[in-house]
Amino acid sequence: MKSIYSHARVRTLAAAAMAIAATFNAHAGFFIPKDTTMVMGMITPTESMTETAFGITRDTSVALGVSTMTNAARSYRWQMVHAQATKLVGRVFNEDGIGNAYVFAGPLAARAVEARGYGRDFDGTRYGAHAGVWLDYETRRYYGRASWHGYKTSAFAWNETITQAMVAPYLADYEDVATFVGVQAKRRTDEPQTEVTPYLRLFKKTWWIDAGVSVNRAHRRDVFINLMHTF
């Protein structure tokens, strides 16, 4: 009986993990189950993104998205269009939770937008690539994530590192609304401070909402919102 219960519990955790696999900064690294479509949007004062992804196999998804990036000093701003393939390269189950490892990469096109008082840092459209790695571990009570995402064109190179840690104040079944509270730490190229953002996550089956406010000096009171829906 214990063995049957344990296997059922792992299957439930696996279903939950695939439905709510963490993102985004947000953003890149989402894994989408086969034949599932995901639409998401993320916005902060220095970043925004909209993306649509589709799961083509059990361990591979593809995506198209549009994003905007601004540095903390607001001295330059880029708009990008990207395509992406995400591959699940490792998954570890135990009685309490699931660990996942993803890699992702794809082409991008970027152009500079005039920043107030600074102008553009390059002209025309520049083409390049982006890639990254995403590691996470989840139980019904705890969630942790570490990711790296790099962008490269002839005009700029940009890296972003994110760590997240969350805890659920109560245990929720997969059919119910679940709540996590936690903190995100993000470090971006050429920025002297790590952006620290306490935030709240709500999710249920096919939808997900993140909301938080940054507290470090360079990003103080910057609001972070991330929305996701699968169908």
Regions found by a protein language model. Name each.
Residues 1-32:
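Cleavable N-terminal export/targeting peptides
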Residues 28-197, 207, 215:
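Outer-membrane pore/translocation modules
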Residues 83-85, 200, 219-231:
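Outer-membrane beta-barrel "beta-signal"
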Residues 203-205:
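Alpha-helix capping and inter-helical loop/turn segments
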